Amino acid sequence: MFKIKRQKSKASKLEWEEANDIRKHALEIVKTLDFSHINTQRLFFFRTSGSKSRAYARTWPFPKIFQRALGIEPAYVIEVLSEYFDKLDEDNQKKVLIHELLHIPKNFSGSLIPHIGRNRNLHRQANFFFEEYKKSKA
């Protein structure tokens, strides 16, 4: 009997591209919901394809140690994962963007707000702000 060697699947190629369409939607959300603590000049957007992650989107902070070492201001990157995010309808895409923007703290320090904390649930907050967003657009 022959033994069949299992071949490892080749890793898919991870690709990034600037996501100006996502930037436009996020800036509209920031303005509509008055998220004035967010410095939109230090907010960057990318669309990723080929990722193994099952998330719709992720928020990446620029770590404080790098900020100090390089002498630059805090910054955030919001990455949308094309395989999942692009399949969502427009309302759910906006809800995901609101969720990601809520990870950015009021002091825009380069840290992240976790999903659940004392007296806070980010998912509930995202749903609340999405409803507020929809009301203001009606």
Residue locations for each model-derived region?
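Short pre-active-site segment immediately N-terminal to the catalytic Zn-binding motif
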Residues: V80-V96
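Active-site recognition of the HExxH zinc-binding catalytic motif
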Residues: Q93-N107
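Post-HExxH zinc-binding segment in Zn-dependent metallohydrolases
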Residues: F108-A138
